[in-house]
């Protein structure tokens, strides 16, 4: 294999994930086989690969940028936060337990390092002529964590990777970020840094020339690029950044409110709607006013019962019920659909609130006649279906859930199955409760025809003309965005120092 490359950052949110994706696409253009890899990631924005293994969405995106199918070996350790300083631990795509922050490295460091090396071996055997493109996590110089590092310098030294250090100038203090990071590196670690990259620069590049010269003189490391500010092309890995995303669209014709749940997961499900020029997404947090949007989406949740509690305590749940009863459109995805049901029971405490007695199940929003029980085994699979609502359409996506939802006995006359597989989701026929529907299929909005059919239901209610439904799926738009990202990266970044040329 070619010498591995690694993208490190001075902090979380510096832009490592997108710069890694850009690097993968650029190497692919140059005839290489880049292989994305992040030893350990912490995220509730997940993807399910063809084998039924969970991995972080950011590594799936990097795989697409590299022209490869995502596989969980590209992210062998995934930590999915579930509140109270506890995370679900995923090794090579499968759940292996939960861990508390204070004991994680004591209990899970050795098993984690073992599966990371196993995944690396598998990838190296599968792509003998490839080049690993590694992504670090957070900052590589968190002094209190370095002894148990699984993702940054331990991996860089193990593979003798050539490293790129990315700093976000938008946050301010970029010189302190870089100089502070380099000063905390040991000499043997600093030798691995082959280039510096300034990310999210606004304005004319020549205004940074003096700063670039100073950094190179002080560090002895070339500044190989200054990436301009790009309106965020893809969802941030951290859900805390969601409210800082795009502003108001000038051409938006419909507004869709999306509930920003405390344990929000799989928010990349909404990315195809973000890409619709006539759609404005408005993220609504518990405790804020819902208003009368044209539709409401309840996305997935890592802690469904806990998030349902939050909706009820804040009054947002009752606002949503009133909205639906007034004829509004409500759509739930996975945990969001479960919340729309009558009851939710979690006897094992998997979703935030333990309900050991079925009779003590938590009440849902009661907008769909569903009862849900959360079970130990998790449904993990990619799937294809033919929808029956809003109309016939081929759709594909993936399932990722503990909950098993069943229609209440005698309620079949009040709902329609969404697809040829009735368990994929349901839509209410009760017009007094609005157009309420839900699905277990993550990625449903990636399907272009289905997305437009759903949007046209909303547009019809507003008296707007239908949008064309004969369109491509979002994966083609994603390809265009990846190419745009790589175009800008190629224009502004010289990767030769990384390649040793």
Curated annotation (Swiss-Prot):
Pathway: Cofactor biosynthesis; adenosylcobalamin biosynthesis. GO terms for biological process: cobalamin biosynthetic process. Residues 253-450 form the GATase cobBQ-type domain. Keywords: Cobalamin biosynthesis, Glutamine amidotransferase. Disulfide bonds: none annotated. SUPFAM superfamilies: Class I glutamine amidotransferase-like (SSF52317), P-loop containing nucleoside triphosphate hydrolases (SSF52540). One of its GO terms (molecular function) is ABC-type vitamin B12 transporter activity. The active site is at 334 (nucleophile), 442. Pfam families: CbiA, GATase_3. PROSITE patterns: GATASE_COBBQ. Gene3D superfamilies: 3.40.50.880, P-loop containing nucleotide triphosphate hydrolases (3.40.50.300). Catalyzes amidations at positions B, D, E, and G on adenosylcobyrinic A,C-diamide. NH(2) groups are provided by glutamine, and one molecule of ATP is hydrogenolyzed for each amidation. Belongs to the CobB/CobQ family. CobQ subfamily. This is Cobyric acid synthase.
């Amino acid at each position: 294999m070619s010498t591995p490359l690694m993208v490190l950052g001075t902090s979380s949110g510096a832009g490592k994930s997108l710069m890694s994706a850009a690097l993968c696409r650029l190497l692919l253009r140059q005839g290489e086989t880049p292989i994305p890899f992040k030893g350990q990631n912490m995220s509730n924005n997940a993807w399910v690969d063809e084998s039924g293994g969970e991995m972080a969405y950011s590594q799936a995106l990097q795989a697409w940028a590299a022209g490869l199918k995502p596989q969980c070996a590209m992210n062998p350790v995934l930590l999915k936060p579930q509140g109270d300083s506890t995370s679900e631990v995923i090794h090579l795509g499968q759940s292996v337990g939960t861990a508390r922050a204070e004991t994680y490295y004591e209990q899970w460091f050795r098993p984690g390092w073992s599966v990371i090396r196993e995944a690396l071996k598998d990838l190296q055997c599968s792509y003998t002529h490839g080049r690993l493109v590694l992504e670090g996590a957070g900052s590589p110089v968190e002094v209190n964590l370095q002894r148990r590092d699984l993702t940054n310098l331990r991996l860089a030294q193990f593979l003798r990777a050539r490293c790129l250090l990315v700093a976000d100038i938008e946050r301010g203090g970029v010189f302190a970020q870089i100089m502070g990071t380099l000063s905390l590196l040991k000499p043997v670690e600093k030798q691995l840094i082959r280039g510096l990259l300034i990310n999210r620069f606004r304005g004319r590049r020549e205004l940074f020339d003096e700063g670039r010269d100073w950094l190179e003189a002080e560090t002895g490391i070339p500044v190989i690029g200054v990436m301009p500010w790009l309106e965020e092309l893809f969802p941030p890995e951290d859900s805390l950044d969601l409210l800082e995303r795009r502003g108001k669209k000038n051409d938006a014709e419909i507004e869709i409110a999306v509930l920003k749940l405390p344990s929000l997961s799989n928010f990349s499900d909404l990315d195809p709607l973000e890409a619709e020029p006539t759609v404005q997404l408005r993220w609504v947090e518990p405790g804020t006013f819902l208003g009368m949007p044209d539709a409401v989406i309840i996305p997935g949740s890592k802690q469904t019962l806990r998030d349902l509690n939050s909706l009820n305590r804040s009054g947002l749940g009752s606002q949503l019920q009133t909205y639906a009863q007034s004829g509004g459109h409500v759509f739930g995805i996975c945990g969001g659909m479960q919340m729309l049901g009558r009851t939710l029971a979690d006897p094992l405490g998997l979703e935030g609130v333990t309900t050991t007695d079925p009779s003590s199940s938590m009440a849902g929003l009661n907008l769909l006649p569903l009862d849900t029980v959360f079970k130990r085994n998790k449904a993990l699979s990619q799937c294809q279906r033919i929808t029956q609502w809003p109309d016939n359409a081929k759709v594909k996506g993936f399932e990722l859930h503990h909950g098993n939802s069943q229609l209440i006995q005698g309620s079949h006359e009040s709902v329609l199955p969404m697809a040829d597989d009735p368990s994929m989701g349901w839509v209410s026929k009760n017009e007094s409760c609005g157009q309420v529907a839900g699905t277990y299929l993550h990625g449903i909005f990636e399907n272009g025809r289905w997305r437009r059919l759903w949007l046209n239901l909303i547009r019809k209610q507003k008296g707007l003309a239908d949008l064309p439904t004969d369109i491509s799926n979002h994966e083609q738009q994603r390809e265009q965005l990846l190419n745009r990202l790589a175009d800008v990266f190629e224009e502004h970044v010289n990767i030769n120092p990384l390649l040793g040329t």
